[in-house]
Amino acid sequence: MNSKLQKVYRDSKYGFMDEMGNIIIPCQLNSAGDFRDGLARIVDQDKKHGFIDETGKIVIPCQWNEAGDFSEGFASVMDENGKHGFIDKTGKVVIPCQWNEAGGFSEGLASVTDENNKLGFIDKTGNVVIPCQWFGPYAFFSAGLAEIVDENWKHGFIDKTGKVVIPCQWEYIGDFSEGLARVEDEDKKYGYIDKTGQIIVPCQWNGAGDFSEGLASVKDENGKRGFIDKTGNVVIPCQWDYVEADFRDGVAVVMNIRNGSMHFYDINKNGKVIGKGGNFF
């Protein structure tokens, strides 16, 4: 669970405030991450990493050369030898520092890289459940799938058994949103695939965003942006210079530049302008 405390920066120091703007943790920290699982990463004057709770109390001393955010009760840490392992929320080392890199836990598994810089996955006991054979420093599971990269730097997906379910054939793969992920082919064109790897929207766009409320922004060959549905049909023509915010509660924010000014508009799912924002120089 994420905290309602928000990080603030004043006089070159970090602190935290609540939703009402009240300072809960004074701005006296050299560096701070966001709260995750009730703890936030901090860095002291010696550039050592530790963690505080939501009262500002240091609950894990600043003794690590690096640390990641807590996820599923564990945080990755790096020791003085440059090796990574994991601690629990008491600061106890639960997985020894023996890996070249380590990502956060997601769906019970965390990515690690071995001495050959090959990537695999371990469980919360530290056992290797997916052998180290892939490239890239980090990977995370979402909805049972994790993106992987092969020796040719092509992207695909594996499931939690390590089986390749979407072959490594793409230059880029985005996260799945509403069942579809955007992909980039060798011609630098974008389209969308489903979780079986089937191409649902052909790679024909110069840019593409995630699906939200059934629509995704796309960019045409003229650099203009519009929206498509999940079948690939253009439902809002490409006429905008930028999409500032995807659809939420039936409204998206788009922008055009005219004579050096940025003009913002709220549009509905029919593409109709229903409100205007300010103009910025």
Model-derived features with residue positions:
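Residue-level detector of conserved, function-critical positions
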Residues: 1-281
